[in-house]
Amino acid sequence: MRTIISLLLLSAMVFAVIEAISLEEGLQLFEGERGCVGENQQCADWAGPHCCSGYYCTCRYFPKCICVNDNGK
């Protein structure tokens, strides 16, 4: 009886780990598919929206962070 209960608990733990990994991978794919913002648009590196390629987020006038051209930075 103990063996059966142990196997059931082990199976549940394995299932939970597999489910958590697949959920995390799905969230990462979703984050990559989100749109980006361009020059002088409001951004937040830590939470999004993120700047498009060629721009970076600067917070000179916090809390209004904006995307600026990186000019080869």
UniProtKB/Swiss-Prot annotation:
Cellular compartments per GO CC: extracellular region; host cell presynaptic membrane
Propeptide: 21-34
Predominant place of localization: secreted
Subcellular compartments: Secreted
List of residues that carry Asparagine amide: 71
Keywords attached to this entry: Amidation, Disulfide bond, Ion channel impairing toxin, Knottin, Neurotoxin, Presynaptic neurotoxin, Secreted, Signal, Toxin, Voltage-gated sodium channel impairing toxin
Disulfide bonds: 36-52, 43-57, 51-67, 59-65
UniProt-listed InterPro entries: Beta/delta-agatoxin_fam
Pfam families in alphabetical order: Toxin_7
Distribution of this protein across tissues and organs: Expressed by the venom gland.
GO MF term list: sodium channel regulator activity; toxin activity
Signal peptide: 1-20
Domain characteristics, as noted in the entry: The presence of a 'disulfide through disulfide knot' structurally defines this protein as a knottin.
UniProt function note: Insecticidal neurotoxin that induces an irreversible spastic paralysis when injected into insects. Modifies presynaptic voltage-gated sodium channels (Nav), causing them to open at the normal resting potential of the nerve. This leads to spontaneous release of neurotransmitter and repetitive action potentials in motor neurons.
Family as reported in the entry's similarity comment: Belongs to the neurotoxin 07 (Beta/delta-agtx) family. 03 (aga-4) subfamily. Aga sub-subfamily.
Designated name of the protein: U3-agatoxin-Ao1e
